């Protein structure tokens, strides 16, 4: 093998114990096939990939339980040991005794993740030839998966992330009446959206919309049936208020209506809602569940042997050079020793305690992919911790400390917490954020108390154990590994396991003690989301039923009015009802009271629209009064003239037209004869006629004067 070999197709795994003088190291080179995005680096001890290291001086043999390879990364690390394929049991005598071998080791760096350098020692002092295990801590694993997700952003969503959701959706479909189905559909849609699979995201969001539309249709049908029955049995006398109505006044209805008209669901699902802080009893129970999950995760890896950590050593340099993260086997023994009442293996405990969980719908929102197979019911945790002051005992001096800081948590547990806190673009953070959001709603859906109690401790480690997960990840520019920086940070506390005991106790106290302000803030957020959810449902119901109810009320009032009026009066009559009794108002009327407080028409004007003045302080006795009816009548103006007057006027007009015509004709002819030819036949005839008529006129005037004088 030389430097030109592709790093991703020939991955070499080795223990980092090759540069110690006086040690006899046996190396076995194993080629692992290149796999996909999933980091499957846990190796079974009985397979061909088992890595064995032997120490000739000490006579101990250890089995590597987990390597630190990320199969998607091909960056060379700064480790100084490399495998030799043609030599076994070759003594490593230091730089001076065997320089060619060391030089060859330096030429062939193993292909590792750059973040895996934090878990490997740079060198060990002479004389202390103890094989150091390479363990992948939570930070490096989470970072590797984040980089892999960034590189393979166009890949389809991971099946393990959506498989629990699909199983829950199938369970909800089997029930046929579950209210949690739209929540699961929304979570699947958001998961696909974060994975940039927009087609499937649109399909699931459309399914959620169809569910809510059918829900609104069903609610509208129920409301119509209730309104019909209410109108049929509406009493004519005022009924006394029932006991259920005494505790819910108008202000409560107004507050509910305000919430229902101002919510923004499901836009709030994008927010990262803080989990509800449990009580001290549940916090101690959360610690027991976390330790139990660590045991189950380590047992699921199928390691045949458990590696014990070395006890206290006279030389303090050894603990300073030792990586801050211990091997998985060390973690397993430590957690079992710290809590002896917990079962040793999680497989048996999981099969025994699984029937105690009555509802598995909350598992999706409260667990990650790494802890999905090792989850136990709340009964196991309650058996492990029976009082509120029960916390896991700190590790003894025979084992390394586990909880000295957030980075020392078991690998699978730390990976789950790291992915929850970083909020990368994978499918898992979307599920967890939606889990927090849907948990508040499912409380309103009256889920069993046991499942709600089980879901609370699952969200706790985000705020306590992952407070500083990425601060030690930055390596120095001169090539120093993270183990030396961890030694400088912890100081003398990392020298002996006895010193780690105090650190364990302090860490547990910090995780159990939470600020009351954070608890109140989280409770306020959860209550606000619950109110928004109820508000959205009520608002849609009101909008659907408002039009139908108003139309029916108008028809009923108009029909009552038309029965009392004649056909002519009914065509011009409108009505205005007095406000009805408040005790018989429906939700629509209450909502209208909030939107339109009061509508008073101007004096002297009559509105042609139906008005409803609902005053809050109206007395129930007003319903007994007959509603006043205001009638508006229109009459046509009688402006027709009598027949006699019309005939007389026509005659006068005709006479006037005749006189005007005579004058025009006579005057025109006279003007023509005066200015024109007098000897023309027309003028001659006109002169004869004028003489004749003028003579007759003079005779008539003379006779008239004679009769006037005589009278």
UniProtKB/Swiss-Prot annotation:
Record flagged with keyword Transmembrane helix: yes
Cytoplasmic side: 1-650
Top-rank taxon, per record: Eukaryota
Biased composition (Basic and acidic residues): 396-407, 457-471
A biological-process GO annotation: positive regulation of Golgi to plasma membrane protein transport
Residue numbers spanned by region Disordered: 1-157, 294-332, 370-389, 394-432, 457-496
The keyword Transmembrane helix is assigned to this record: yes
Extracellular face of the membrane: 672-711
PANTHER family in alphabetical order: CONSORTIN
The name this protein goes by in its record: Consortin
Organism: Mus musculus
Upper classification of the organism: Eukaryota, Metazoa, Chordata, Craniata, Vertebrata
């Amino acid at each position: 093998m030389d430097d030109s070999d592709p790093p991703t197709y020939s991955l070499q795994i080795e223990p980092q114990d090759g540069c110690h003088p006086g040690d006899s190291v046996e190396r076995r080179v194993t080629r692992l096939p290149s796999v996909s995005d999933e980091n499957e680096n846990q190796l079974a001890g009985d397979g061909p990939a088992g890595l064995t290291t032997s120490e000739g001086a000490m006579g101990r043999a250890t089995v590597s339980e987990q390597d630190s390879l990320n199969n998607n990364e091909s960056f060379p690390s700064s480790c100084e040991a490399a495998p030799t394929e043609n030599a076994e049991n070759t003594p490593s005598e230091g730089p001076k005794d065997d320089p060619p071998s060391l030089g060859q080791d330096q030429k062939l760096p193993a292909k590792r993740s750059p973040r895996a350098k934090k878990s490997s020692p740079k060198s060990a002092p002479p004389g202390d030839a103890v094989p150091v295990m390479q363990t992948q801590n939570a930070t490096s694993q989470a970072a590797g998966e984040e980089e892999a997700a960034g590189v393979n952003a166009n890949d389809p969503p991971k099946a393990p992330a959506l498989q629990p959701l699909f199983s829950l959706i199938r369970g909800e479909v089997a029930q046929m009446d579950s209210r949690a189905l739209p929540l699961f559909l929304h979570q699947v849609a958001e998961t696909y959206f974060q994975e940039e699979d927009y087609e499937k995201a649109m399909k699931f969001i459309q399914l959620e919309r169809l569910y809510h539309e059918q829900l609104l249709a069903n609610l509208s049908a129920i409301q119509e049936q209730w309104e019909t029955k209410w109108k049929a049995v509406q009493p004519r006398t005022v009924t006394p208020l029932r006991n259920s109505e005494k505790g819910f006044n108008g202000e409560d209805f107004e507050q509910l209506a305000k919430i229902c008209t101002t919510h923004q669901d499901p836009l709030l699902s994008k927010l990262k809602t803080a989990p509800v802080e449990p009580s001290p009893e549940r916090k101690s129970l959360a610690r027991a569940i976390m330790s139990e999950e660590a045991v189950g995760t380590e047992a699921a890896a199928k390691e045949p042997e458990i590696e014990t950590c070395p006890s206290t050593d006279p030389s303090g340099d050894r603990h300073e050079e030792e990586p801050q993260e211990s091997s998985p086997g060390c973690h397993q023994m430590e957690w079992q020793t710290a809590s002896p009442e917990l079962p040793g293996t999680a497989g048996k405990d999981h099969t025994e305690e699984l029937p105690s969980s009555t509802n598995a719908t909350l598992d999706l929102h409260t667990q990650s992919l790494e802890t999905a197979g090792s989850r136990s019911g709340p009964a196991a945790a309650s058996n492990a911790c029976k009082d509120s002051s029960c916390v896991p005992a700190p590790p003894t001096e025979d084992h390394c400390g586990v909880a000295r800081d957030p980075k020392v948590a078991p690998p699978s547990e730390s990976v789950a917490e790291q992915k929850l806190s970083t909020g990368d673009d994978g499918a898992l953070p979307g599920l967890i954020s939606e889990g927090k959001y849907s948990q508040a709603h499912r409380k309103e859906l009256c889920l069993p108390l046991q499942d709600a109690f089980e879901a609370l401790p699952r969200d706790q480690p985000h705020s306590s154990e992952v407070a500083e997960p990425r601060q030690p990840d930055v390596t120095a520019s001169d090539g120093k590994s993270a183990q030396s920086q961890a030694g400088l940070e912890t100081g003398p506390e990392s020298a002996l396991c006895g010193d780690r005991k105090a650190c364990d106790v302090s860490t547990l106290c910090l995780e159990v003690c939470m600020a009351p302000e954070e608890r109140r803030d989280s409770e306020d957020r959860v209550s606000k989301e619950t109110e928004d959810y109820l508000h959205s449902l009520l608002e849609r119901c009101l909008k659907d039923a408002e039009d139908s109810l108003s139309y029916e009320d108008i028809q009923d009032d108009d029909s009552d009015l038309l029965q009392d009026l004649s056909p002519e009066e009914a065509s011009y009559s409108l009505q205005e009802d007095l406000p009805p009794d408040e005790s018989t108002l429906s939700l629509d009327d209450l909502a209208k009271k909030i939107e339109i407080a009061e509508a008073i028409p101007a004096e002297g004007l009559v509105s042609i629209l139906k008005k409803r003045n609902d005053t809050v302080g109206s007395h129930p006795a007003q319903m007994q009064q007959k509603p006043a009816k205001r009638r508006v009548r229109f009459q046509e103006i009688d402006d027709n003239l009598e027949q006699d007057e019309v005939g007389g006027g026509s005659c006068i007009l005709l006479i006037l037209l005749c006189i005007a015509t005579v004058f025009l004709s006579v005057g025109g002819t006279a003007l023509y004869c005066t200015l024109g030819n007098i000897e023309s036949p027309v003028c001659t005839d006109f002169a004869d006629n004028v003489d004749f008529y003028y003579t007759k006129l003079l005779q008539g005037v003379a006779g008239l004067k004679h009769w006037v004088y005589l009278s």
